[in-house]
Amino acid sequence: MPMSQANPRKRIALVIQYIGTHFCGWQRQTAERTVQAVIEETISTVVGQKITIHGAGRTDSGVHAAGQFAHFECESLIPGYKWAKILNDRLPPDINIRGACEVSQDWHAQFSAQWRRYRYTIYTHPTPNLFIQPYAWHYYQAPLDETLIQAALTPLLGEHHLAAFQRTGSKRSHAWVNVQAAECSRRGSFIHIEIQANGFLYGMVRLLVGMLVDIGQGKLSLAQFQDIWKNEKRHLVKYSAPAKGLCLLRVGYPEPLFPPHIWFDTQPTFLLTH
């Protein structure tokens, strides 16, 4: 979606990876290290202007992203595709720009998105692994039945009012979510829970996973689970799964801006197949 060459102000889209361990989330906060603030400061240094970037989603403190999208505007002669290398040469090692391109003025990282997909990773091997520890919840206390977890996920497909899975402090005016995919799979010692929806409530996936683990080990029945979310019994949703297991996997748009190897297959192989 190229912009007119007569307009010196450009809108640039970015595909961003980050390791969330040492960030207080995506959104800029006073006196805190956040992904948005670090990228904004880096771009501002390059162009000599104060820059604001807009992300497709706001990940919480400690949550990772394999394919976050964002955009910013600036007055610069730098071609859109060159921004990836320019920023990667200046950004800290826990942020990586996988791709950049120029887009039209009506393209918006948040409002043009049709869906977001999150993956939660649980590592069930009894022995801790330092190379996996930062990116997965090490849960080995009891066996987890992925078929029970999938049975709990399937009824969530479609549009539902999921206020039971919304943390306090949310600024959303409603809790309606259109869940397009909800899948649980096991690969070796890993259990992956993936949720795709048009949008997500504050803390939704981690609250949901906390209950799914209880279902997977037989502590909570499928009937009890459905009663909780269908009747919005938020007071019974007491545990939020650790942030480190959650990753914003990818974001979908009507027209892909980048080839699949840039925005789609972006998580480390060992988290997919081990």
Curated annotation (Swiss-Prot):
The active site is at D60 (nucleophile). It is an enzyme of class 5 (isomerase). It catalyses: uridine(38/39/40) in tRNA = pseudouridine(38/39/40) in tRNA. Keywords: Isomerase, tRNA processing. The keyword tRNA processing applies. Its EC number is 5.4.99.12. InterPro entries: PsdUridine_synth_cat_dom_sf (IPR020103), PsdUridine_synth_TruA (IPR001406), PsdUridine_synth_TruA_a/b_dom (IPR020097), PsdUridine_synth_TruA_C (IPR020095), TruA/RsuA/RluB/E/F_N (IPR020094). Pfam families: PseudoU_synth_1 (PF01416). GO terms for biological process: tRNA pseudouridine synthesis. Homodimer. Formation of pseudouridine at positions 38, 39 and 40 in the anticodon stem and loop of transfer RNAs. PANTHER family: PSEUDOURIDYLATE SYNTHASE, TRNA PSEUDOURIDINE SYNTHASE-LIKE 1. Belongs to the tRNA pseudouridine synthase TruA family. This is tRNA pseudouridine synthase A. It comes from Picosynechococcus sp. (strain ATCC 27264 / PCC 7002 / PR-6) (Agmenellum quadruplicatum). The gene is truA.
